């Protein structure tokens, strides 16, 4: 009997249904000589430093670096029952083979292997490797199970990734947190990503905009533009020379251009476009795609390929025709799909591009949640576009002379809309404008053609700063980090993997190093300060991209895991030995920002709120309002920020409900600041005057 272990319950249910294991028991499905059970994500994790030695539970510089060998592992809190269920199933006498059906990728391999090792299982392992949750794909994959040993290199790559993250994260986080007296989360991939955000923010801050001018020449049905003028007087002088002058068309060039269909989606391009069109975060897009995968509507989402394999040509053709029947695509012109343009066996490693499945003909798309529906239609649109004809147009450039100055007008004439028709119809359904082009149609200008009485206007413009990163542009930057320093034949470049980049962004936001402002991702002051104090090995996108490339080489059997880990350990040791102390100014970088609540009545410096007082920022001044001053505690009133603010601003404040010990009752009065310049501040009470009645009584 085979025991199949999936990564999550929903996947196990689909596998069990497809393979005929229809009987549900406690923690597994059974039937057809199969048992199907599940993990719940990472059941087994590396032990925290404190687990190796009680001494490590407290963060101290003298304990660093912490370099465990061998690494130890523990069960994730709250998942003990799930693990014990799997161990019991593995140990059943009638189970002779274990099938690893966790996600077909690096992390899925790690999740299964760590459970298998901790359970002490030694039974043979086979690997289910599929890219779709369709019943047919599951059955086909099950008929072609591979020996688990074929994926040993992938497992070693996953282990190296996990150990490297632990070593860098634990040691660097403890080191800089101890030095700066604040928890500073440092990560092997998240910190270089933060560095890119900080660098872009600095460029925006330091950008100096420059003014320039353009001359705009109005012609029959078109507008031609001059070169830039940096001197406004020169621009006005040129405009004066052109106004009313004759205009001559000096050249007209026409060039037929062809824009090939876009490639299919991998996860990163799907996340980027979903951010542009709908504002979805990378994590939201991954969650929607994962849900659609588990509903059998999309293929495996965590892929870095944008092509299909040759054996998928027939299936792809069928899916294309099904997608073309869905609104809004059913309004497109008839076209014959060019499936061969999407096929490239050499560009598919673990998983092919993301496409819809044959299940779409069985599902009511309108019944899907909005986010999933939008994403699903995006993938359908991309499949149709990728298999359509090229977009063909004629690019027209006309140049003109007026008053001795040259002007240029650009336009285009569409010859065949091709794939852009599908894209245009989809965007129209979203009320989105089509992608920008290079101008509209130009009149039929001819060389030597002349125009009388030129109309010229001077327009003012400014150079623009770099734009803040959005999730779209940050994902692109992460994907391409280190690209120029890694050989072209390398399979993976960049920071992280398609499957991990969303989580990296979320960690930076959760740690308070990055904040979302609309679609923009902006580093916080703490984030910028962190990048400032960290050494280059921890902030360099290029170095981290090279590490990611090494992990890929390990997964392919082309690099030694031990050499990789030795390099990580050496780097950690060097960082710890280099950073043993910091300057006094450095200690202030992560001090919490204090709110100014008023001005000191003695010296005029700002007054800040502290834990126990409201004190002048100039310590030599000595002005302090103590929160536990007996004046307030005896009257059972709290010296609040509002009361302190009023006292500093007006010298007095009205306070209600003060307690009188003598009368055993509350009363209202004005409290007046009575500062005599001594060590302690005095206060006076002023009671409202009672009104005198007409008979003289109060």
Question: What role is predicted for each listed range?
Answer:
Residues 232-265, 271:
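Metal- or metallocofactor-binding catalytic centers and their adjacent structured scaffolds
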Residues 2-3, 79, 90, 173, ...:
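Basic, low-complexity terminal or inter-domain segments flanking catalytic cores
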Residues 30-32, 218-222, 401-405, 663:
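Short strand-coil-strand connectors
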Residues 71, 93, 135-219, 254-258:
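C-terminal or mid-to-C-terminal helical accessory/interaction module adjacent to the motor/catalytic core
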Residues 1, 101-104, 181-183, 254-263, ...:
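Conserved short loop/turn motifs at secondary-structure junctions
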Residues 9-16, 33-36, 40, 76-87, ...:
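Amphipathic alpha-helical transducer elements in NTP-driven molecular machines
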């Amino acid at each position: 009997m085979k025991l199949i272990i999936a990564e999550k319950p929903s996947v196990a249910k689909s596998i069990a249904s497809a393979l005929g294991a229809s009987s549900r028991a406690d923690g597994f499905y059974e039937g057809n000589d199969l048992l199907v059970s599940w993990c719940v994500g990472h059941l087994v994790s590396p032990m925290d430093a404190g687990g190796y030695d009680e001494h490590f539970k407290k963060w101290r510089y003298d304990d660093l670096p912490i370099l465990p060998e061998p690494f130890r592992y523990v069960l994730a809190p709250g998942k003990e029952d799930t693990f014990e269920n799997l161990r019991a199933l593995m140990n059943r006498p009638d189970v002779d083979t274990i099938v690893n059906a966790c996600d077909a990728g690096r992390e899925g391999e790690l999740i299964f292997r760590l459970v298998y090792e901790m359970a002490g299982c030694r039974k043979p392992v086979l690997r289910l490797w599929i890219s779709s949750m369709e019943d047919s794909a599951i059955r086909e994959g099950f008929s072609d199970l591979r020996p688990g040993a074929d994926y040993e290199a992938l497992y070693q790559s996953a282990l190296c990734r996990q150990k490297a993250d632990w070593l860098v994260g634990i040691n660097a986080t403890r080191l800089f947190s101890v030095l700066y007296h604040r928890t500073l989360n440092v990560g092997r991939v998240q910190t270089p990503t933060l560095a890119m955000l900080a660098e872009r923010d600095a460029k925006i801050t330091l950008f100096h905009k420059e003014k320039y001018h353009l001359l705009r020449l109005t012609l029959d049905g078109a507008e031609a533009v001059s070169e830039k003028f940096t001197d406004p007087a020169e621009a006005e002088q040129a405009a004066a020379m052109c106004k009313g002058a004759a205009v001559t068309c000096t050249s007209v060039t026409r060039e037929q251009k062809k824009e090939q269909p876009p490639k299919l989606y991998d996860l990163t391009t799907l996340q980027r476009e979903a951010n542009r069109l709908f504002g979805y975060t990378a994590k939201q897009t991954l969650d929607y795609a994962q849900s659609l995968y588990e509903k059998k509507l999309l293929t495996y989402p965590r892929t870095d390929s944008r092509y299909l394999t040759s054996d998928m040509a027939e299936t792809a053709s069928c899916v294309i025709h099904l997608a073309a029947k869905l609104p809004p695509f059913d309004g497109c012109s008839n076209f014959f799909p060019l499936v061969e343009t999407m096929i490239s066996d050499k560009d598919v490693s673990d998983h092919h591009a993301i496409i819809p499945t044959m299940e779409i003909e069985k599902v009511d798309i309108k019944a899907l949640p909005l986010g999933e529906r939008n994403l699903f239609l995006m993938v359908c649109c991309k499949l149709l576009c990728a298999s359509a004809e090229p977009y063909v147009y004629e690019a027209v450039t006309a140049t003109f002379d007026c008053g001795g100055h040259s002007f240029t007008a650009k336009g285009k004439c569409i010859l065949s809309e091709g794939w852009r028709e599908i894209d245009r119809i989809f965007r129209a359904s979203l009320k989105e404008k089509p992608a920008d082009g290079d101008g509209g149609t130009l009149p039929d200008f001819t060389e030597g053609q002349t125009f009388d009485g030129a109309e010229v206007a001077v327009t003012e413009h400014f150079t623009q700063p770099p734009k803040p990163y959005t999730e779209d542009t940050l994902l692109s930057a992460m994907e391409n980090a280190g690209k120029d320093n890694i050989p072209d034949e390398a399979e993976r470049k960049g920071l992280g993997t398609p499957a991990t980049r969303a989580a990296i962004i979320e960690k930076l936001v959760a740690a308070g190093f990055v904040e979302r402002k609309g679609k923009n991702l902006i580093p916080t002051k703490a984030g910028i300060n962190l990048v400032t104090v960290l050494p280059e090995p921890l902030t360099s996108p290029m170095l981290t991209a090279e590490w990611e490339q090494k992990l890929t080489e390990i997964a392919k059997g082309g690099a030694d895991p031990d050499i990789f880990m030795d390099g990580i350990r050496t780097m950690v040791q060097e960082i710890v030995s280099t950073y043993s102390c910091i300057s006094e100014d450095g200690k202030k970088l992560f001090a919490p920002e204090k709110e100014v609540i008023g001005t000191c009545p003695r010296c005029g410096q700002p007054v800040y709120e502290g834990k126990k007082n409201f004190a002048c920022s100039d310590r030599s001044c000595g002005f302090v309002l103590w929160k536990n001053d007996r004046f307030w505690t005896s009257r059972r009133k709290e010296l609040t920020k509002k009361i302190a603010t009023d006292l500093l601003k007006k010298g007095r404040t009205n306070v209600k409900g003060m307690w009188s010990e003598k009368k055993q009752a509350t009363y209202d009065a004005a409290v007046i600041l009575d500062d005599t310049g001594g060590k302690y501040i005095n206060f006076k009470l002023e009671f409202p005057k009672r009104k005198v009645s007409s008979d003289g009584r109060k």
